[in-house]
Amino acid sequence: MINKTLLQKRFNVAAVSYDQYANVQKKMAHSLLSTLDRRYSANSSIRILELGCGTGYVTEQLSNLFPKAHITAIDFAESMIAVAKTRQNVKNVMFYCEDIERLQLEETYDVIISNATFQWLNDLKQVIRNLFHHLSIDGILLFSTFGQETFQELHTSFQRAKEEKNIQNETSIGQRFYSKNQLRHICEVETGDVHVSETCYIERFTEVREFLHSIRKVGATNSNEESYCQSPSLFRAMLRIYERDFTGNEGIMATYHALFMHITKEGKR
């Protein structure tokens, strides 16, 4: 289970540094936005709900792409919303500080979009059902999240360190994510046309600590309530193995496995 209080605190702290370190999240955002750009014309007066708007990177792009749209942007970290409101072009946006899993929607939307957020939900299936209910006919629910191969180098190095030290417990170094098939199954809804795609981004860093620092700066450190690594000696072993086994000519590598889901609400024409 995700500890929402801890997660909220971390995102509030990370608000000032998020954009500087969110390289992969921005790439994922552009993939989502290109789908909308192909689907709707610039003068469309569509209703858009953005969930997990963060610092407003996607929000501003939506406003630029669809200046006549009515955009509602939601995040549960007040500091993130404060940063988002400072962006130059968010004039057609209403911001609200809410938890997605407690959201009480009263309207329907042509587009519901979320970038790199749904991995933080404890009951994704229920959220999908709720959001689908608030899509207009032919509306689209479009989101990205992280898949199971994300940080595979980190998890592999940690497991090898545990084996080296003969540690048998269930401690982990980070959150585990859905596979492509698991996500597809979760997102199956009645009268919905479901499509899922995936891609992997490889980021390079000079050392493992730099990589871990970048994760902290976007607020994405482990927020699970279950056991996690607290042993300094195990952590040092993990760092050593990571740099030994996953260093190339351009530095150490870190995999980000991105899953892209879009669900169209079908109806009678």
Curated annotation (Swiss-Prot):
State the source organism's domain of life. Bacteria
Alphabetical UniProt keywords: Biotin biosynthesis, Methyltransferase, S-adenosyl-L-methionine, Transferase
Identify the enzyme class.
transferase
Q: Per UniProt, what is one GO molecular function of this protein?
A: carboxyl-O-methyltransferase activity
Please state the pathway this protein functions in, per its UniProt record: Cofactor biosynthesis; biotin biosynthesis
The EC number(s) attached to this protein equal 2.1.1.197
List, alphabetically, the InterPro entries matched.
Answer: BioC, Methyltranfer_dom, SAM-dependent_MTases_sf
Give the reaction(s) catalysed: malonyl-[ACP] + S-adenosyl-L-methionine = malonyl-[ACP] methyl ester + S-adenosyl-L-homocysteine
| GO annotation (BP), single | biotin biosynthetic process
Q: What does this protein do?
A: Converts the free carboxyl group of a malonyl-thioester to its methyl ester by transfer of a methyl group from S-adenosyl-L-methionine (SAM). It allows to synthesize pimeloyl-ACP via the fatty acid synthetic pathway.
Q: Which PANTHER family match?
A: PUTATIVE (AFU_ORTHOLOGUE AFUA_2G14390)-RELATED, TRANS-ACONITATE 2-METHYLTRANSFERASE-RELATED
* Family the UniProt entry places it in: Belongs to the methyltransferase superfamily.
Q: Which HAMAP family does the protein's record reference?
A: BioC (MF_00835)
What name goes with this protein?
Malonyl-[acyl-carrier protein] O-methyltransferase
Tell me what organism the protein belongs to: Bacillus anthracis
Its gene? Answer: bioC
